[in-house]
Curated annotation (Swiss-Prot):
It comes from Halobacterium salinarum (strain ATCC 700922 / JCM 11081 / NRC-1) (Halobacterium halobium). Gene3D superfamilies: Winged helix-like DNA-binding domain superfamily/Winged helix DNA-binding domain (1.10.10.10). Belongs to the CDC6/cdc18 family. It holds the Pfam family Cdc6_C. This is ORC1-type DNA replication protein 3. GO terms for biological process: DNA replication. ATP binds at residues 8-12. Signal peptide: none annotated. It comes from the Archaea. Involved in regulation of DNA replication.
Amino acid sequence: MVKGTPLSGKSLLFALTRLDRNNPEKEWFRTSEIHEVYQTVARDVEVEPKGYNRALELLNKHVTTGVLESKKKERGDQGKFRSYSLQGDVESTRTGLINSTPELQTLMGW
């Protein structure tokens, strides 16, 4: 699923699984929401968080590999924004990330 993905890319996906778990009524999350949670995850695993634009590039890379789906919206005065949704089962993605990434295991107390 995410073999060869750098820790920053896995941390972004983990942030999205955290958002999904904490907001079961939502399916789509804006880049800014994901980036905010990602910054916390990155610091928790003691890695320097990537900036917003680099995080956006990494999210789009996950779209091209089929892990994420994205959609663009225009909101008039609020401008354009992109939202992302995990493809497949969120818990399976979360478990796969945790099992394959020792740094993320520390967040789970493993």
